[in-house]
Each structure stands twice: as C-alpha cells, then as structure tokens.
C-alpha cells in the first residue's frame, strides 16, 4: 500500500514553533505551495507579521497561539483548527528549545524543561491530531529531530536526549501508523543558523542559513521518506561514527570539539543543604 502524502487540496497544514527560525520559514514555504497553514507559537505578534508576508501567496497563514507544553490547550487548538480551517492533513511538529547542560552545572529544571517542550510538546499535539487522522484513514506527520540524536555530545545531555527520544518515537509509531495510512517522518538537520544555535557552545561545522535548510525540509516532506538527515557531509560521518565502539566515538568527539582540553566554566561550589 502506498502511504498517504499530504496535499493542500485535501486540507490544511499545522506548524508548531512557527513564529521564528525553521518553523516560520517552513510555514512560509507551505503557504507558497497553496496550503492554509495554521501556525502555533507562544506569541502571536510574530505570526501577525508572517500573515502579512504571505498575504499574496496561493495559500494563507492563520495564527493559533498556544504553549505546546499545555496538553489540554493543545487538544483544543487541534479542534479549533479543524473547525475553522478544515481537516489537518499535514502536521509539522517543530517547536523546540535548546538548553545547554554542562556536566558541572546540572539542574533538574533544565532537563524537565527540555523534555516538556521538545518531546512532550510533540506528544501533546500528536495525540489529538492523530485521533482525527485515524478516523479519516489518512494523514501526514513530521517530527523535527537533530543529528545530535545519534550519540552524546558535550553539553547536550538534555537537548540530545530529547532528539534521540523523538527518533525512537517516530520509529516505534511507524509500525502502527502505516496500518492507519498515516505517514510519519523524522527530519534530522545539522546546524542551522537560528536563535537556538546562537546558544550552542560547540563548533558547528556546515552551519547553514534557514532558507537553505527549509528548502531541504520541504523537499523531504514532498518525497515522503521516513528519515531525512542533512547536510550529508555532516550526517553521514556522524552516522558512521555512531557505529564505532563508544570509547573510540568519544575520543573522536573530544578531539574534534577540543573538549578534553576545555576548562570547566563554573565554580565548584558544594550543593546547597
């Protein structure tokens, strides 16, 4: 059976984290393809400017502000989109944050916040939207991962952990989604020049502009392949590296990031009693 592939003639697209960076650029691209695009973000002001930017395109952008960590409100947002715009045929879960987690300054708060936004921010929208897609026996879901999912990098214990979980989520759900004619994809980009990467303390080889990354993602969504990782000159070596014995993998990462020689950046204070 050929799995369903989203088409703007069949319904609307929904993009989370669409007020800036990759999400904003991708929403603009989808509107240019003729989609009515429901854009969800914390603040509707940036979405208002996006609406103006896309006013002359074949499709349109409509704001549905919501905090992706709010489970009940996300369910209501899905219902509102379905009622006001039509059936969601394409859901792109892009909302995310980046919190650096160096080993000498760990906090439970940082880990919890990372998973609340990056992982449960997907699940909170995925569950209600799939309920609608399942009834219609067709749908298309895209999850935003990262090449940091392949193995542990310095300072990415929280962020990389969420992206690894997203990849497992997609891999596991694909078995049953295939039976329901719901296509699921995971996109693992390398380093993209967005407000999130400005917080990254690691070297970022192959850093690419948002517009270029978005074009690659748009092609991936159209092609429908399960996993897309790019740029290849970065993703392929990382995949090979992930197959090596862990001590060797860590040695290569320490060398390429100069992390072994990097000093600790925080005072060594005893934990509060």
Placement of each model-derived feature along the sequence:
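C-terminal helical subdomain
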Residues: 186, 202-238
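Residue(s) in the substrate-gating loop at a strand-loop-helix junction
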Residues: 146
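Conserved glycine-rich Rossmann-like NAD(P)H-binding loop of the short-chain dehydrogenase/reductase
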Residues: 33-50
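Substrate-binding pocket helix/loop in short-chain dehydrogenase/reductase
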Residues: 102-103, 107-115
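The beta1-alpha1 cofactor-binding region of Rossmann-like NAD(H)/NADP(H)-dependent oxidoreductases
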Residues: 65-76, 108
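Conserved glycine-rich cofactor-binding loop
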Residues: 17-20
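Active-site helix of classical SDR
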Residues: 126, 162
């Amino acid at each position: 059976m050929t799995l369903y592939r989203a088409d703007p003639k069949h319904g609307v697209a929904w993009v989370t984290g669409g007020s800036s960076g990759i999400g904003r650029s991708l929403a603009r691209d989808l509107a240019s393809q003729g989609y009515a695009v429901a854009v969800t973000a914390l603040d509707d002001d940036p979405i208002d400017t996006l609406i103006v930017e896309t006013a002359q395109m074949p499709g349109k952008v409509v704001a549905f502000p919501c905090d992706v960590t709010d489970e009940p409100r996300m369910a209501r947002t899905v219902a509102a989109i379905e009622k006001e715009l039509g059936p969601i045929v394409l859901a792109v879960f892009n909302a995310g944050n980046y919190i650096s987690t160096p080993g000498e300054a760990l906090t439970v708060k940082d880990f919890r916040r990372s998973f609340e936004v990056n992982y449960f921010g997907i699940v909170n929208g995925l569950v209600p939207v799939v309920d609608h897609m399942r009834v219609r026996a067709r749908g298309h879901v895209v999850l935003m991962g990262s090449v940091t999912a392949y193995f542990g990098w310095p300072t990415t214990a929280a962020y990389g952990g969420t992206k690894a979980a997203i990849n497992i989520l997609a891999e596991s759900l694909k078995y049953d989604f295939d039976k329901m004619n719901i296509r699921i994809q995971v996109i693992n980009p390398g380093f993209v020049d967005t407000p999130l990467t400005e917080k990254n303390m690691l070297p970022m080889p192959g850093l690419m502009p948002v517009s270029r990354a978005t074009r690659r993602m748009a092609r991936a969504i159209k092609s429908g392949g399960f996993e897309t990782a790019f740029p290849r000159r970065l993703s392929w070596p990382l995949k090979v590296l992930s197959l090596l014995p862990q001590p060797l993998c860590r040695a290569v990462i320490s060398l390429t990031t100069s992390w072994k020689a990097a000093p600790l950046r925080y005072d060594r204070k005893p934990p509060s009693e």
